[in-house]
A protein has these predicted regions:
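Aromatic- and Gly/Pro-rich donor/ligand-binding loops
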Residues: 80
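Short, basic/aromatic-enriched C-terminal tail that caps enzymatic domains
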Residues: 155-169
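Left-handed beta-helix
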Residues: 59, 65, 70-71, 76-77, ...
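Terminal amphipathic alpha-helical/low-complexity segments used for targeting or macromolecular assembly
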Residues: 1-61, 167-169
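Short acidic, glycine/proline-rich loop/turn micro-motifs
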Residues: 106-108, 167
Length: 169
């Protein structure tokens, strides 16, 4: 009886837990590869959405269309504020930092970015539209990318300009 009670409590705790990296990606790949039946898929999606919601994130998980990951990405800061379109494709060995958006072009939500292998996306980057980020590229902090990026490229912002104004006291 105690063992059953313990298993039930662990099950409930697992459902309401905030984010478990191993469990999240295990469920993600089972859904992505159609390895589970519909009722289990729905339960997995609910659990994944709860984990995402707690972290202010959305990794493109839907019942009929999900973003595609070749392999589990590296998330040094967890899910914190990461948004990925349902139609995005993410390559192998990709590193995604916090507050990154990989989204559609604002017109056609099926036109989402394709991220190559071994790409690093630093905090605050926004990658939008029907574009391709080539393999081994680096997207710098707070960069807004809306054009294709060739392989082996580094994308950075221009140096900030300082505009000095006289005070109007």
């Amino acid at each position: 009886m105690e063992e059953l009670k313990y298993k039930i409590m662990n099950f409930i705790n697992g459902i309401i837990s905030k984010y478990n990296d191993k469990k999240y990606w295990k469920m993600k790949f089972k859904i992505q590869n159609n390895e589970v039946i519909l009722p289990i898929k729905i339960l997995y999606l609910i659990r994944m959405k709860r984990m995402e919601s707690f972290n202010g994130a959305s990794l493109g998980n839907r019942l009929n269309q999900s973003c595609y990951f070749k392999s589990k990405p590296k998330l040094p800061h967890g899910l914190k504020g990461i948004f990925i379109s349902n139609y995005a494709k993410i390559g192998k060995n990709v590193t995604i930092y916090q507050q990154v958006t990989i989204g559609f072009d604002g017109v056609d939500w099926t036109k989402a970015p394709i991220i190559g292998d071994n790409v690093v996306i630093y905090p605050g980057a926004k990658i939008t539209g029907d574009i391709i980020i080539g393999d081994n590229s680096i997207i710098g902090t707070n960069c807004v990318v809306f054009e294709d990026v060739p392989s082996n490229s580094l994308v950075v912002l221009e140096k900030p300009r300082i505009i000095v104004k006289d005070r109007l006291d």
